[in-house]
Amino acid sequence: MSSSSIHTTEGSTPNTAGGMGKEPYSNVSGSQRSSDTLKQQKFIVSDAMAKNSRQLLFAHIYNYLVHNKFYSTASQFLKEVEVPLTTIENIGKIKENTVRDDSSQMRYDDIPENLLRPDMLLNASDTFLVEWWEIFRTLFDHVDGIPNESLDSNGNQEVFKQRIMAILPHNNPTVPPPFINGAENLVDPERHMNIARGSSVSQPSGVLRSPTQNELLNNSQDQRPPQFRSKSMMNGMPPGLSSMSTPNGVEGMQGNFERPTFQQSKSAALPTQRKSSIEEQANRNSSNFSGFGSQSPKNVNEDNEIDSKSAKGKLRSKSSKRGKVGKAAGTPKYNEVDEKHSTMQGSPFSPELLGSNNPVLQNQSKPSAQSQMNGSQWDPNFLMQQQRNPQQWQKLNGNNMQQDIPNSSHPSIGSNNPSNTSHRFNSRRKEQYDSKPEAIGNGSHRSSTSPSAGSVGNMSADYGDQNEYGSNKSSNFSGAFTNNNAMFQEMAKTMNLMMNQKSEEMNQWNKSNPYNMRPDNMPMSTMNWNNFPMPKGTSNSFNKDMLQAMQNKMMQSQSSSGMDPNLQQQYLMMMNMLMNFQSGNGFQSNPTNVYKSRGNDLDFAQPFSSENNLANDQSNIRSSYEAYQEDSKTPSTENGGRKMNMTPSLQSTNMISNGQMKHSTSRFSPTHGAPNQSELNKMESTQRGNDISHNYNPPNNRFVGNNLKSQNFSLASQDESVIAAAKKGRRKLTKLNKRNLATPESTSNTNYPESNKNGISTPNGSVGNKGKQTDINGHSNYPDNPFELFNI
């Protein structure tokens, strides 16, 4: 054994004799620490001399190796670890003071000379450390007997892996925290401090308990009206407290409180309040009433009496019996409220219930006459009447005409408060207003299949300052969008969701696609866009409302003094992108991809060049509405007596292509996008396999052929070569269409939708084919409602 067999350094203290105070080989230098030297001094390995559990383990392992005659391993083990050593003299003294097990005495006559003789107090098989070693040895032997191919498999690797749970929870940075930025979580810090300090309300001992701080804090975050809060604690008042002397105590627990009055009987009359408190409260409430477009109360009760029924939450009014509004304790009652100008009668959002410190009431401004029309500006009849009869429109607005519409009294509709923007895009509110027809403006009705007028109608009047006649001021129109930025922010979110999110529905569509092709490289003439889903996380109703709102804003700009061309071009760009995705076309950054997938049925229009060009294009929208009204008055016999119920919003919206308004009365003409017979035969034979007699499936979105020209017109309009190629292909397609129209029998085998005398395509095809067309999977290509193509 070399000098490194025993791991002791020069000058270090070797193992002692377990409290005997004698160093076994302290007189042996480092150069003399060899196996011969140790043997001459009769050193042995003993578990009794172990200083710690590590040395105890090494001693038993060494004993186990020697006992089982693993001499080579024991020799290597003795070189690498530090085992407890002692001399024979010390062992003799230990034996005298220790009861040893005779079974632990072993014969080491055949031990090699290079090994030390172990002398253990316990046998190796009696120690738990050696039992662990035996278990590991058995496991190692088992692993050595398994082929390497089996060990490399994933199944066997999982057996040796130990699952360790993390101490800290997993914090995913992409997942937002579960915190709702609502009114119930936004509490005034000053109010928190007042509640923490406690109120100065004196309470009689033995009658009521004092409210705890947790009750006050929990109740302070409750921003509901008082009559909807818990009865145990309302606005910081202790249970059983009927009233307080000042209204300030009801609103925010601020100010000095007098001794409250506790009523044992419900029928007992409340004490008389001071006149100054009533006048102060009346002035505050009158200012809140003006925020909803109503006048201040005319008469206040001069007797300063509060009826006992007011404690039960009843607000009595002589002139109005439409509804009774609950009233908080300590507030005055009104004898009369002007019914002609008030929109708050019967509404649960009265200032008494919400309190004057409500942020919705503080940010509320008087609605204009146009916003009081409650969504009627989306109706084309109403817009035409406004243009043809401006004096009548001015007369109506001068009279401040009111309509009994649910959203007229709602604080989140028709307001300039940016915090209420989310209400305007709420699909639940849209379904509520679309559930039944309501009277709007000029006698028109909205149905469940039409775009939401309740949630979208007022949207166009929500941005920008307005004059007394309801039209936007041109000086503040673009600035309002720059300041509020609400619509553009929502549109940006929608764009990001549409372009960046790869949803599970997209993968499902790829699996179910019979051609196993993606929509971006698939010919649009063979796409079944009903099976193409919207991206996960986007709302169809939101996209529809966004399109409707942008179209309303553009239509509204005609009655105003103009609109910034740059701003309107941004509108058109976003509308075109939203419409293309709604129709299933998706977004493409390279405009040349459009030619690869669409063929020759494309033409690009130039963007605005001047404000005069913009005005001319806007005037074409009005004429298109008139043409639509004439076409939709009488049903046509060519389409089976079916009348096309098209809403004007999409009528004008789909005429927008490449940043320019295009006037077209024949919007659904089959000449745009219809391939000839040779192209059909080639397409059917290559993509459908062997059967050419299948019905040809045109794109479900019949708006794509003529109106939605480009995927990214901002790039295409700048590429002159692309525009030139598009015009050239357009001329070629026109010749093909003329030939196809001259010989209609050439396309008789294809059930491409016919058009009536007005140029409007019928969803059910020609007269001879009354049934709906189906694709190879049996799915209907043409729904009953043509707006289902836009997921509307």
Curated annotation (Swiss-Prot):
InterPro entries: LisH. Its main location: cytoplasm. It is found in: Cytoplasm; Nucleus. It comes from the Eukaryota. The keyword Oxidoreductase does not apply. Residues 1-34, 197-377, 397-477, 624-707, 734-792 are annotated as: Disordered. Residues 53-85 form the LisH domain. Transmembrane segments: none annotated. Residues 285-294 have a biased composition (Low complexity). Residues 311-325 have a biased composition (Basic residues). Transcription factor that regulates pseudohyphal differentiation, invasive growth, floculation, adhesion and starch metabolism in response to nutrient availability. Belongs to the MSS11 family. This is Transcription activator MSS11. The gene is MSS11.
